[in-house]
Amino acid sequence: MLHPKLGRVMNVVYYHSVVFALMSTTLRIRSCRKCLRLEKVSRTYTIYSFFVGIFLFLNLYFMVPRIMEDGYMKYNIVLQWNFFVMLFLRAIAVVSCYGTLWLKRHKIIQLYKYSLIYWKRFGHITRAIVDKKELLDLQESLARIMIRKIILLYSAFLCSTVLQYQLLSVINPQIFLAFCARLTHFLHFLCVKMGFFGVLVLLNHQFLVIHLAINALHGRKARKKWKALRSVAAMHLKTLRLARRIFDMFDIANATVFINMFMTAINILYHAVQYSNSSIKSNGWGILFGNGLIVFNFWGTMALMEMLDSVVTSCNNTGQQLRQLSDLPKVGPKMQRELDVFTMQLRQNRLVYKICGIVELDKPACLSYIGSILSNVIILMQFDLRRQRQPINDRQYLIHLMKNKTKV
């Protein structure tokens, strides 16, 4: 059972991934029959994926125009270094993304098959236990969250496009080609973040469905309740393993996403500083779209962090929902045994998301993430202060030298 709104918005995410070759193979989606299955693995799509990856990597060459000679970065070494660091990180992101898809292609296809089998198996259990209205309400709320994320991504892309166009000093074929290459990479990064967010939405959906199933067991008869609880426990364990498998398989690719998001936020805020001190000339439209870019970028980042934390929290907080069943006055021996098994399973299996197995991402880490962005921007501002003081000190030194010569 899938709400039509959630189905349509997930189709949007899927087709974005297909266009930028972020899938190892295509899916066959029949909306009329609500059927979802793997297509026959196509060599054509594999070749298409290869050419898209090569195209994006070669595009990096055209992203270095003569902007260093006659653009707004000409007299700012910090902006130039930021540009080259972003270029290097984009190269790493492209290599890690498509390298993961090519090197782990067969494993990813097996993951697709496993996910579809999982969805069909526990879909019947969900329909049998969970109230239909509660399930549809949950799916509709997740669809709204996904739609909001898509709007944020495209709003940030629009603001960035307008600002990038305004920053062009002259319009010639070489600079326009570099501009188009940057837009292509912006769209690719947009699709990667959209796909990652879509996977998190689906995982969050499954863990929240488990919560609904546990709550629904209160009204069931005692003789059937223990069997339903066993099915819910199996569903939770399979969902947990599926989440771990997804996180491990795309660990490096997701790590490059977070690193690029980090550097993008620093770059945006540092450009905002340059706008505020008039180092970069702008008009009212530039200020408007610049402020919009800051708002949409940070809003989108916080939305991604919040969804990731929601997946981890909804998985690890299942025990709190299970305590409600333990507090029931009449619990049979079979029911008590299933409760004990499920409780032990929850204690031994907790979901944690770590970047490359090192940095754990949770709410405190998100606050540290934002704080480190601001601290790095402040450090970059110190270079501006030194550059502004340097000409003054040189002029004072020359004046002092001329006075000494006149005295002699």
Curated annotation (Swiss-Prot):
Tissue: Expressed in the adult labellar chemosensory neurons, labral sense organ and thorax. In larvae, is in neurons of the terminal external chemosensory organ as well as in the dorsal pharyngeal sense organ.
Source species, domain of life: Eukaryota
MF annotations from Gene Ontology: ligand-gated monoatomic ion channel activity; taste receptor activity
All ranges on the Cytoplasmic side of the membrane: 1-44, 104-150, 215-245, 306-364
Membrane topology according to the record: Multi-pass membrane protein
Positions on the Extracellular side per record topology: 66-82, 172-193, 267-284, 386-408
Subcellular location(s) of the protein: Cell membrane
Entry keyword Transmembrane: yes
The protein's name in its UniProt record: Putative gustatory receptor 58b
Organism of derivation: Drosophila melanogaster
TM region(s), chain numbering: 45-65, 83-103, 151-171, 194-214, 246-266, 285-305, 365-385
GO cellular component terms, semicolon-separated: axon; dendrite; membrane; neuronal cell body; plasma membrane
GO biological process, one term: signal transduction
Keywords: Cell membrane, Glycoprotein, Membrane, Receptor, Transducer, Transmembrane, Transmembrane helix
Assigned protein family: Belongs to the insect chemoreceptor superfamily. Gustatory receptor (GR) family. Gr22e subfamily.
Sugar attachment sites: 277, 404
Function: Probable gustatory receptor which mediates acceptance or avoidance behavior, depending on its substrates.
